[in-house]
Protein backbone atom coordinates (compact mmCIF):
# COMPACT_ATOMS: atom_id res chain seq x y z
CA UNK A 1 0.00 0.00 0.00
CA UNK A 2 2.83 2.42 0.88
CA UNK A 3 4.56 1.64 -2.45
CA UNK A 4 1.31 2.31 -4.39
CA UNK A 5 0.87 5.72 -2.75
CA UNK A 6 4.45 6.61 -3.63
CA UNK A 7 3.87 5.62 -7.28
CA UNK A 8 0.74 7.79 -7.48
CA UNK A 9 2.65 10.81 -6.16
CA UNK A 10 5.42 10.26 -8.70
CA UNK A 11 2.94 9.95 -11.57
CA UNK A 12 1.19 13.15 -10.52
CA UNK A 13 4.51 15.01 -10.39
CA UNK A 14 5.38 13.95 -13.94
CA UNK A 15 1.95 14.98 -15.23
CA UNK A 16 2.30 18.40 -13.60
CA UNK A 17 5.60 18.98 -15.37
CA UNK A 18 4.56 17.94 -18.89
CA UNK A 19 0.97 17.42 -20.01
CA UNK A 20 0.18 15.90 -23.40
CA UNK A 21 -3.37 14.99 -24.39
CA UNK A 22 -4.47 13.95 -27.89
CA UNK A 23 -3.10 12.35 -31.02
CA UNK A 24 0.38 13.13 -32.35
CA UNK A 25 1.16 15.75 -29.73
CA UNK A 26 4.79 16.46 -28.95
CA UNK A 27 5.73 18.18 -25.68
CA UNK A 28 9.48 18.48 -25.17
CA UNK A 29 10.45 20.69 -22.24
CA UNK A 30 9.33 21.11 -18.67
CA UNK A 31 5.97 22.51 -17.57
CA UNK A 32 4.48 22.50 -21.08
CA UNK A 33 0.82 21.76 -21.82
CA UNK A 34 -0.12 20.30 -25.22
CA UNK A 35 -3.70 19.28 -26.00
CA UNK A 36 -5.68 17.92 -28.97
CA UNK A 37 -4.12 16.93 -32.29
CA UNK A 38 -0.76 17.34 -34.05
CA UNK A 39 0.51 20.14 -31.84
CA UNK A 40 4.27 20.54 -31.49
CA UNK A 41 6.35 22.15 -28.75
CA UNK A 42 10.07 22.29 -29.54
CA UNK A 43 12.72 23.75 -27.26
CA UNK A 44 10.21 25.79 -25.25
CA UNK A 45 9.55 25.90 -21.51
CA UNK A 46 6.16 26.57 -19.89
CA UNK A 47 4.54 26.43 -23.32
CA UNK A 48 0.85 25.94 -24.10
CA UNK A 49 -0.43 24.52 -27.40
CA UNK A 50 -4.17 23.89 -27.64
CA UNK A 51 -6.07 22.94 -30.77
CA UNK A 52 -4.71 21.39 -33.95
CA UNK A 53 -1.47 21.83 -35.84
CA UNK A 54 -0.08 24.51 -33.52
CA UNK A 55 3.63 25.09 -32.97
CA UNK A 56 5.36 26.66 -29.97
CA UNK A 57 9.11 27.00 -30.35
CA UNK A 58 12.22 28.88 -29.36
CA UNK A 59 13.46 31.99 -31.18
CA UNK A 60 17.11 32.75 -31.89
CA UNK A 61 16.61 36.42 -32.87
CA UNK A 62 14.93 39.48 -31.36
CA UNK A 63 15.23 43.25 -31.50
CA UNK A 64 15.89 45.82 -28.80
CA UNK A 65 14.57 49.39 -28.78
CA UNK A 66 16.48 51.94 -30.83
CA UNK A 67 19.02 54.16 -29.08
CA UNK A 68 18.35 57.00 -31.50
CA UNK A 69 15.68 57.88 -34.07
CA UNK A 70 17.11 56.35 -37.24
CA UNK A 71 19.27 53.59 -35.81
CA UNK A 72 19.29 50.78 -38.41
CA UNK A 73 17.63 47.44 -37.75
CA UNK A 74 20.92 45.56 -38.06
CA UNK A 75 22.26 47.47 -35.06
CA UNK A 76 19.27 46.59 -32.89
CA UNK A 77 19.07 42.90 -33.71
CA UNK A 78 20.04 40.50 -30.95
CA UNK A 79 20.81 36.79 -31.16
CA UNK A 80 20.25 34.29 -28.39
CA UNK A 81 17.84 31.62 -27.25
CA UNK A 82 14.40 32.78 -26.08
CA UNK A 83 11.95 30.00 -25.31
CA UNK A 84 9.55 30.36 -22.38
CA UNK A 85 5.90 31.11 -21.60
CA UNK A 86 4.56 31.22 -25.17
CA UNK A 87 1.03 30.17 -26.14
CA UNK A 88 -0.61 28.96 -29.38
CA UNK A 89 -4.37 28.34 -29.40
CA UNK A 90 -6.52 27.35 -32.37
CA UNK A 91 -5.49 25.81 -35.69
CA UNK A 92 -2.06 25.96 -37.34
CA UNK A 93 -0.78 28.87 -35.24
CA UNK A 94 2.87 29.56 -34.41
CA UNK A 95 4.23 31.22 -31.26
CA UNK A 96 8.00 31.70 -31.05
CA UNK A 97 10.29 33.14 -28.41
CA UNK A 98 9.35 34.31 -24.91
CA UNK A 99 5.81 35.32 -23.91
CA UNK A 100 4.48 35.24 -27.48
CA UNK A 101 0.75 34.66 -28.11
CA UNK A 102 -0.80 33.31 -31.32
CA UNK A 103 -4.55 32.66 -31.50
CA UNK A 104 -6.92 31.90 -34.35
CA UNK A 105 -6.17 30.15 -37.62
CA UNK A 106 -2.68 30.26 -39.15
CA UNK A 107 -1.62 33.26 -37.05
CA UNK A 108 2.06 33.87 -36.28
CA UNK A 109 3.68 35.60 -33.29
CA UNK A 110 7.33 35.26 -34.13
CA UNK A 111 9.39 37.14 -31.52
CA UNK A 112 9.40 37.97 -27.82
CA UNK A 113 6.16 39.41 -26.42
CA UNK A 114 4.50 39.55 -29.82
CA UNK A 115 0.73 39.03 -30.18
CA UNK A 116 -1.12 37.70 -33.24
CA UNK A 117 -4.87 37.11 -33.05
CA UNK A 118 -7.07 36.28 -36.02
CA UNK A 119 -7.00 34.39 -39.31
CA UNK A 120 -3.47 34.65 -40.77
CA UNK A 121 -2.55 37.55 -38.49
CA UNK A 122 1.21 38.11 -38.23
CA UNK A 123 3.22 39.86 -35.52
CA UNK A 124 6.72 39.57 -36.89
CA UNK A 125 8.97 41.49 -34.51
CA UNK A 126 9.54 42.09 -30.82
CA UNK A 127 6.61 43.73 -28.98
CA UNK A 128 4.50 43.83 -32.15
CA UNK A 129 0.72 43.28 -32.16
CA UNK A 130 -1.51 42.13 -35.02
CA UNK A 131 -5.24 41.63 -34.45
CA UNK A 132 -7.65 40.84 -37.27
CA UNK A 133 -7.83 38.79 -40.45
CA UNK A 134 -4.50 39.10 -42.27
CA UNK A 135 -3.43 41.99 -40.06
CA UNK A 136 0.35 42.40 -40.11
CA UNK A 137 2.72 44.18 -37.71
CA UNK A 138 6.22 43.86 -39.10
CA UNK A 139 8.35 46.27 -37.08
CA UNK A 140 9.40 46.63 -33.44
CA UNK A 141 6.54 47.98 -31.27
CA UNK A 142 4.20 48.22 -34.25
CA UNK A 143 0.45 47.63 -33.95
CA UNK A 144 -1.98 46.58 -36.68
CA UNK A 145 -5.63 46.19 -35.73
CA UNK A 146 -8.34 45.43 -38.28
CA UNK A 147 -8.92 43.47 -41.48
CA UNK A 148 -5.69 43.52 -43.50
CA UNK A 149 -4.31 46.39 -41.44
CA UNK A 150 -0.56 46.93 -41.93
CA UNK A 151 1.92 48.52 -39.52
CA UNK A 152 5.41 48.32 -41.00
CA UNK A 153 7.22 51.25 -39.40
CA UNK A 154 9.00 51.40 -36.05
CA UNK A 155 6.39 52.21 -33.37
CA UNK A 156 3.74 52.61 -36.07
CA UNK A 157 0.00 52.16 -35.51
CA UNK A 158 -2.59 51.09 -38.10
CA UNK A 159 -6.18 50.77 -36.91
CA UNK A 160 -9.06 50.04 -39.25
CA UNK A 161 -9.86 47.87 -42.24
CA UNK A 162 -6.93 48.07 -44.70
CA UNK A 163 -5.34 50.93 -42.74
CA UNK A 164 -1.59 51.30 -43.41
CA UNK A 165 1.11 52.93 -41.28
CA UNK A 166 4.33 52.31 -43.16
CA UNK A 167 6.96 54.64 -41.70
CA UNK A 168 8.52 55.28 -38.30
CA UNK A 169 6.07 56.62 -35.68
CA UNK A 170 3.30 56.88 -38.28
CA UNK A 171 -0.38 56.57 -37.32
CA UNK A 172 -3.26 55.58 -39.61
CA UNK A 173 -6.77 55.31 -38.20
CA UNK A 174 -9.83 54.63 -40.33
CA UNK A 175 -10.80 52.39 -43.21
CA UNK A 176 -8.07 52.52 -45.90
CA UNK A 177 -6.27 55.36 -44.11
CA UNK A 178 -2.61 55.72 -45.14
CA UNK A 179 0.26 57.26 -43.18
CA UNK A 180 3.46 56.70 -45.16
CA UNK A 181 5.63 59.62 -44.09
CA UNK A 182 7.95 59.67 -41.11
CA UNK A 183 5.86 60.77 -38.07
CA UNK A 184 2.85 61.17 -40.40
CA UNK A 185 -0.74 60.93 -39.13
CA UNK A 186 -3.89 60.09 -41.10
CA UNK A 187 -7.29 60.01 -39.38
CA UNK A 188 -10.48 59.17 -41.26
CA UNK A 189 -11.65 56.81 -43.99
CA UNK A 190 -9.35 57.19 -46.98
CA UNK A 191 -7.23 59.90 -45.33
CA UNK A 192 -3.64 60.10 -46.61
CA UNK A 193 -0.53 61.62 -45.03
CA UNK A 194 2.40 60.74 -47.25
CA UNK A 195 5.27 63.04 -46.29
CA UNK A 196 7.43 63.89 -43.29
CA UNK A 197 5.28 64.97 -40.32
CA UNK A 198 2.26 65.52 -42.55
CA UNK A 199 -1.22 65.34 -41.02
CA UNK A 200 -4.59 64.54 -42.59
CA UNK A 201 -7.85 64.71 -40.62
CA UNK A 202 -11.17 63.81 -42.24
CA UNK A 203 -12.57 61.40 -44.82
CA UNK A 204 -10.37 61.43 -47.93
CA UNK A 205 -8.31 64.32 -46.58
CA UNK A 206 -4.84 64.42 -48.12
CA UNK A 207 -1.53 65.92 -46.95
CA UNK A 208 1.16 65.21 -49.54
CA UNK A 209 3.98 67.63 -48.70
CA UNK A 210 6.41 67.81 -45.78
CA UNK A 211 4.81 69.39 -42.67
CA UNK A 212 1.52 69.90 -44.54
CA UNK A 213 -1.85 69.62 -42.79
CA UNK A 214 -5.28 68.92 -44.28
CA UNK A 215 -8.37 69.29 -42.09
CA UNK A 216 -11.84 68.43 -43.38
CA UNK A 217 -13.43 66.01 -45.84
CA UNK A 218 -11.51 66.00 -49.14
CA UNK A 219 -9.21 68.79 -47.94
CA UNK A 220 -5.95 68.70 -49.90
CA UNK A 221 -2.65 70.17 -48.66
CA UNK A 222 0.02 69.82 -51.34
CA UNK A 223 2.61 72.47 -50.46
CA UNK A 224 5.41 72.60 -47.89
CA UNK A 225 4.20 73.84 -44.47
CA UNK A 226 0.73 74.53 -45.87
CA UNK A 227 -2.67 74.04 -44.22
CA UNK A 228 -5.88 73.19 -46.05
CA UNK A 229 -8.73 74.03 -43.70
CA UNK A 230 -12.30 73.01 -44.41
CA UNK A 231 -14.22 70.62 -46.66
CA UNK A 232 -12.76 70.50 -50.16
CA UNK A 233 -10.16 73.19 -49.49
CA UNK A 234 -6.80 73.19 -51.28
CA UNK A 235 -3.48 74.98 -50.85
CA UNK A 236 -1.42 77.06 -53.25
CA UNK A 237 2.17 78.24 -53.42
CA UNK A 238 2.93 81.06 -50.99
CA UNK A 239 3.64 84.33 -52.84
CA UNK A 240 4.69 87.85 -51.86
CA UNK A 241 1.74 90.21 -51.32
CA UNK A 242 2.44 93.97 -51.23
CA UNK A 243 -1.21 95.03 -50.89
CA UNK A 244 -4.70 93.77 -50.05
CA UNK A 245 -8.23 95.04 -50.60
CA UNK A 246 -10.75 94.76 -47.76
CA UNK A 247 -14.32 96.11 -48.05
CA UNK A 248 -13.34 98.29 -50.98
CA UNK A 249 -10.29 99.75 -49.29
CA UNK A 250 -6.80 98.92 -50.54
CA UNK A 251 -3.97 98.63 -48.08
CA UNK A 252 -0.35 98.51 -49.24
CA UNK A 253 3.26 98.75 -48.15
CA UNK A 254 3.32 95.37 -46.46
CA UNK A 255 6.67 94.48 -44.98
CA UNK A 256 6.14 90.71 -44.79
CA UNK A 257 7.11 88.65 -47.82
CA UNK A 258 5.56 85.27 -48.43
CA UNK A 259 7.66 82.26 -49.40
CA UNK A 260 7.13 78.61 -50.12
CA UNK A 261 9.17 77.77 -47.01
CA UNK A 262 6.72 79.64 -44.81
CA UNK A 263 3.75 77.92 -46.40
CA UNK A 264 0.17 79.03 -46.80
CA UNK A 265 -3.23 78.62 -45.16
CA UNK A 266 -6.28 78.08 -47.36
Which residue ranges define each predicted feature?
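Bacterial Sec-dependent N-terminal signal peptides
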Residues: 1-29
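Periodic small-residue-enriched repeat registers in elongated scaffold domains
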Residues: 27-266
Amino acid sequence: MREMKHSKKLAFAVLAAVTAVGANVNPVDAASVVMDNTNVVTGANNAVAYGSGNTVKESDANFRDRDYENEPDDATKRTGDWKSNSVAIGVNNTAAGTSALAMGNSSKALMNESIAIGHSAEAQRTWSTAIGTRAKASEVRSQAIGYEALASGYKSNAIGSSAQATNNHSVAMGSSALASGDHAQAFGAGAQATNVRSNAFGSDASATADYAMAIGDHANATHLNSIALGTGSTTSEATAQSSATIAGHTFGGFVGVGSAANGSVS
